[in-house]
Amino acid sequence: MSISFDLTIDDTRDQLARHARASLEAKPSLIGMSREEMAAALIAAGVPERQVKMRISQLWHWLYVRGVSDFADMRNISKDLRAMLAQHFTIARPEVVEEQISQDGTRKWLFRFPPRGAGRPVEIESVYIPEEGRGTLCISSQVGCTLTCSFCHTGTQKLVRNLTSEEILAQLLTARDRLGDFPDKDTPDGAMVPAEGRKITNIVMMGMGEPLYNFEEVKKALLIASDGDGLSLSKRRITLSTSGVVPEIYRTGDEIGVMLAISLHAVRDELRDILVPINKKYPLAELIKACREYPGLSNAKRITFEYVMLKDINDSLDDAKLLVKLLQGIPAKINLIPFNPWPGTNYQCSDWEQIEKFADYVNAAGYASPIRTPRGRDILAACGQLKSESERLRKSERLALEAMMIAGHGE
């Protein structure tokens, strides 16, 4: 049995018009700014330059260690300065439209972000996957996707826009709010707090969109998430998943340095061209070369290769042999993901016996190849089926959302 909380009311045309007007008057958010950007913003707002370094340190602590979302809660900052900050900036959380809790503990949030410029409000989902000893948050980087992977439900939704670094981080901050994962902070009304201990230990960029097609905003968000003076997530607990944007894979290794996951799904170019069409631009030889050259690879820092199991498509023993040959010499883990059907798809999940044979061969060749147990199916939060309908705001009703989320995630 799953639990669902509808946390908003239906939008009307008048409400949408108010959203549009508000977007033109929106104050910039301090969340998602680099220290350099925050310094420039504070100086422009009137903070004396000699105080800026100290003020950034204070703000960073309140935003990312204490998790406050109201300047009034920043108790070691003067009342006058708090008023000035509130006049010029915002640190508000996005609207939580809906929260769903699966019978297996998986949680899914539908977040609404305000419009950018003349655009409409957009909605995206984040999924929290609890496991023994860790909790993983699956984060989106775009609204929609451009990649049109044939087996993926998200690929049937056109790209609406990129998310900003603020919106990427807001998913993490709001999830921590609702899980009671900030110290000495009251949880929001209606939040259902799980057992004690740090709730979010890992994040994976495996939600909606291709993170490397939004490189600069994703980079900024992940560097803030891994900053030791704030959210302080180890880069070994942050995994970025890509379908194979080869030039940005090199940049990811050089400029971000987080764990890498590759949505592989096929070991022959002619098949991968169909399943993952970006392969036509960056074929397997180029992709695997970039993986081999990813900085710092070792048995402790492996690349995760994601492989969805499609019946009679990519699940033969010959495919397993080619997979082992393709990855030879790369420190790697191979996540085998049973396909989750969605309305309109022509693909089927491989038989369980065939998945196990495939896994046994890959394991015998020396590669860890766990078969991912689907999580959150009862709340539409399982592998490869995330799809927001936020680009189709109904005329007088709130947005409907149908979504599933990749459950394979990093260590």
From Swiss-Prot:
Residues binding S-adenosyl-L-methionine: G209, E210, S241, S263, L264, H265, N340
Q: Which cysteines are joined by disulfide bonds?
A: C138-C383
Q: Record's InterPro entries?
A: Aldolase_TIM, Methyltransferase_A, RlmN_N, RNA_MTrfase_RlmN, rRNA_lsu_MTrfase_RlmN/Cfr, rSAM
> Which sites bind [4Fe-4S] cluster?
C145, C149, C152
Query: What does the cofactor field's note say?
Result: Binds 1 [4Fe-4S] cluster. The cluster is coordinated with 3 cysteines and an exchangeable S-adenosyl-L-methionine.
Show where the Radical SAM core domain sits: 131-380
Q: Which cofactor does it need?
A: [4Fe-4S] cluster
**Pfam (any one):** Radical_SAM
Q: What's any GO biological process attached to this entry?
A: tRNA methylation
Q: List locations, semicolon-separated.
A: Cytoplasm
Q: Which PANTHER family match?
A: 23S RRNA METHYLTRANSFERASE, RADICAL SAM CORE DOMAIN-CONTAINING PROTEIN
Main function: Specifically methylates position 2 of adenine 2503 in 23S rRNA and position 2 of adenine 37 in tRNAs. m2A2503 modification seems to play a crucial role in the proofreading step occurring at the peptidyl transferase center and thus would serve to optimize ribosomal fidelity.
Q: What else is known?
A: Reaction proceeds by a ping-pong mechanism involving intermediate methylation of a conserved cysteine residue.
| Protein name, entry field | Dual-specificity RNA methyltransferase RlmN
Q: Which organism is it from?
A: Brucella canis (strain ATCC 23365 / NCTC 10854 / RM-666)
Gene encoding this chain? rlmN
